[in-house]
Structure formats: structure tokens, C-alpha cells
Swiss-Prot record:
Belongs to the NOB1 family. SMART domains: PINc (SM00670). This is RNA-binding protein NOB1. Residues 180-196 have a biased composition (Acidic residues). It is found in: Nucleus. Its EC number is 3.1.-.-. It comes from Mus musculus (Mouse). Its main location: nucleus.
Length: 403
């Protein structure tokens, strides 16, 4: 297995202690990945790495491109800001050393196409026998015994599609033959078990662990990403980038996602929607889908009962608040929200070369910390104003009501 020329490592590669020096020649990452690692054992390994770890920040245009692509695949809510930067760095290295002609600009969307295949008759109805095709009466007469008149025609044709009576002697011979074959198979299995084939024993456990820890890399790969995050792997595969596996954790195929309303059962491929476009309720759930050979859509539902658990959905709404910086719960799709702009003092920029510049008390830029927007940590529209999107993987504080 030849090592890859350029490898981008995620936090999962360091946490799993992946042998990156054997996987790639040049190892890249971003500083936010190292800051995410908190446990002592991993930080000690990072202090004495047997290879050079290169820190490189992705360009803004690649971050924007990966963000838009992840929104179309439906993995954007599952990705943090650090994950998007790692994906953007992989895309940037692929563009620098290989090119972007083979990469996809749009993911494969799942579309519902009607199938023209319909059963001719209803099947498996208890108490009724429905033949697949109606046979002509003349054919039934030719195959059966010769009938003297038209009166016996119905009974002669009936004998051909009814269930024949079982032959006891033939079934007994088949059971005896099957029993002998099963005994021979059991003896062969016992002989193979004695050899230890297929079992994990103390003698071959280290060899099996080495095979599982190997990174399965395709041939002629210049740039790859080592990550254990399935959402990141799905985005990489749909873009056409290479995913390097650690401990066998690799997405076998790229999945497409849709949003399905569990209130009216309507589906949509627009993954940015929060409310259902048909009934207007906040009842959309992400469902993975695959397209069959005949064009029909196959949805994969989760068996976990917590997916549709109604606990915590009924609660008292707070009193609506007014004002420029009011934050009210988002209840409807057409609900209007304030723009949440920065204060005028914070929006001012200090440009000493401007013709209208007047030197004040200090030539340095002023940092607004006393206004209402600064206290609420409001950012401008160009910097992600409104409802800021935080890290979905960060731990949330649980507020316990004191008695």
C-alpha cells in the first residue's frame, strides 16, 4: 500500500491514534482541530509526533463552496465550523495538486419517478386462487383428458390449476436424502472448526487487529482526508474526494437525504426548510433515501423510538417581547424577526488615510463593549447576524431549577 502524498487529518484521526506517518507523506490539519482535543493522552501524543504536522488555513471561497454543497446534501446541520474548514482544506489541496475538473458541483438529488409496473391481479388473497393469466379453454382440453362434451369442459380445466395432492412416498424419500446431506455437512463443519478457520484465537488476534487498523487507500490517490465523522465522509464522497478509512470506519456508499413530514407525510428535497411547506408545522425529519433500479424511492426509517418522541414538545410559550433586540421563539415560517444590527459606534472603521479623518483622543479603533448589541454579542449581517449557528457537537449546559 503506497502512502498518499497529501493527507488532511481530522480530530478523529488523532483520537484513534491513527498511524498517519504510514498513511501519508505530508500531513495537514487546522489549528481548530488541535484545540478541540482535550484529553491528556492525545495531547501527549501530539507533543511528540513522529512526523511533521503542517497547519494550513483554507481560503474563504472554498469554505463557501463546501458550505453550500453540504446544505444541498443535508449534512450541514451535523457539521461544525471546524468540520467545514477541514472539508474546505481537502478541497483546496485537491484543487492545487490534482484539479477540480473531476469534482462534482451538485450532489445527486433523489427524485421520485412513477413506475409503470403494476400487478395484473391481486396476489396472496386467503381463500381464493387467482391465476396469473387466463388460459384458453382449448389449451386446457388438449393438455388434459379428452372430454366428450361441453358439459365436462369446466371440470377438466379446473383440475389443472388446483393444488395437486401430495405424494407421500416421494416426500419421504426427499426427507431421508436431506437428512443424510445435513449429517455430512455437520461432520465437515466440525472438521473445519477443529482447524480454527474463521475463529479469533490468541494466536491470530494480533494479525486480525493489524488488518482492521490498516487504512484501505485506492491506487493513484494524491489527496485524501482521514476522518471518522460519517457526515464529513458523506460530503467528501458526494463531492468526489477521497476518504481514507481508520479501523474500517468508512462510508461504503454516499447517501442522499430528504425531509419528511411526520404530520402530513409529504417529502421535500430542500434541506434548508424548517417548517413543512404543505401543512406548515415544524414536523420535518431527516430521512435517508436510496433509488431503486426501477426509479422508485426507498426511504430508510429509524427503529429508534426516540426519533419521534413527543417529550418536551408541549410547553408554555413566553410572553412576546418587542424592541430591536427581542428574541422570540420561531413558530411560523413567515414570522418576522429584527435585523439585529451592530451599534453605530461598532460599525465605524478607523481609516487614518481617509480625507475626512480627524484625529481623536486615540488613533486606534474603538471597541464597543457597552452598547446593548455588544452585551448580547450581536454580529453584523456580513459576519453572520441574526440567529448564530453554534457548534452542534458542543456540550450544552443543563439548567436545574433550584428549589
Amino acid at each position: 500500500m503506497a502512502p498518499v502524498e497529501h493527507v488532511v487529518a481530522d480530530a478523529g484521526a488523532f483520537l484513534r491514534d491513527a498511524p498517519l506517518q504510514d498513511i501519508g507523506k505530508n500531513i495537514y490539519t487546522i489549528r481548530e482541530v488541535v484545540r478541540e482535543i482535550r484529553d491528556k493522552a492525545t495531547r501527549r501524543r501530539l507533543a511528540v509526533l513522529p512526523y511533521q504536522l503542517r497547519f494550513k488555513e483554507p481560503l474563504p471561497e472554498y469554505v463557501r463552496l463546501v458550505t453550500e454543497f453540504s446544505k444541498k446534501t443535508g449534512d450541514y446541520p451535523s457539521l461544525s465550523a471546524t468540520d467545514i474548514q477541514v472539508l474546505a482544506l481537502t478541497y483546496q489541496l485537491e484543487a492545487e495538486f490534482v484539479g477540480v475538473s473531476h469534482l462534482k458541483k451538485e450532489p445527486e438529488k433523489a427524485k421520485v419517478s412513477s413506475s409503470i409496473q403494476h400487478p395484473e391481479t391481486a396476489l396472496h388473497i386467503s381463500g381464493f386462487h387467482l391465476p396469473s393469466k387466463s388460459k384458453p379453454l382449448q389449451e386446457a382440453v388438449d393438455r388434459g383428458h379428452a372430454a366428450d362434451g361441453p358439459e365436462n369442459l369446466e371440470f377438466s380445466s379446473f383440475m389443472f390449476w388446483r393444488t395437486p395432492l401430495p405424494n407421500i412416498d416421494r416426500e419421504l424419500q426427499e426427507l431421508l436424502i436431506d437428512g443424510r446431506e445435513e449429517e455430512e455437512e455437520e461432520e465437515e463443519c466440525e472438521d473445519s472448526d477443529d482447524d480454527g478457520g474463521g475463529w479469533i484465537t490468541p494466536s491470530n488476534i494480533k494479525q486480525i487487529q493489524q488488518e482492521l487498523e490498516q487504512c484501505d487507500t485506492p491506487e493513484d490517490v494524491q489527496v485524501g482526508c482521514v476522518t471518522t465523522d460519517f457526515a464529513m465522509q458523506n460530503v467528501l464522497l458526494q463531492m468526489g474526494l477521497h476518504v481514507l478509512a481508520v479501523n474500517g470506519m468508512l462510508v461504503r456508499e454516499a447517501r442522499s437525504y430528504i425531509l419528511r413530514c411526520h404530520g402530513c407525510f409529504k417529502t421535500t428535497s430542500d434541506m434548508n426548510r424548517v417548517f413543512c411547506g404543505h401543512c406548515g408545522n415544524k414536523t420535518l425529519k431527516k430521512v435517508s433515501v436510496t433509488i431503486n433500479d426501477d426509479g422508485t424511492l426507498h426511504m430508510h426509517f429509524s427503529r429508534n423510538p426516540k426519533v419521534l418522541n413527543p417529550r418536551g414538545l408541549r410547553y408554555s410559550l413566553p410572553t412576546p417581547k418587542g424592541g430591536k433586540y427581542a428574541i422570540n421563539p420561531h413558530l411560523t415560517e413567515d414570522q418576522r424577526f429584527p435585523q439585529l444590527r451592530l451599534s453605530q459606534k461598532a460599525r465605524q472603521k478607523t481609516d487614518v488615510f481617509a480625507p475626512d479623518y480627524i484625529a481623536g483622543v486615540s488613533p486606534f479603533a474603538e471597541n464597543d463593549i457597552s452598547s446593548r448589541s455588544a452585551i448580547l454579542q450581536v454580529r453584523d449581517g456580513m459576519l453572520g447576524a441574526g440567529r448564530r449557528r453554534l457548534n452542534p457537537n458542543a456540550s450544552r449546559k443543563k439548567f436545574v431549577k433550584k428549589r
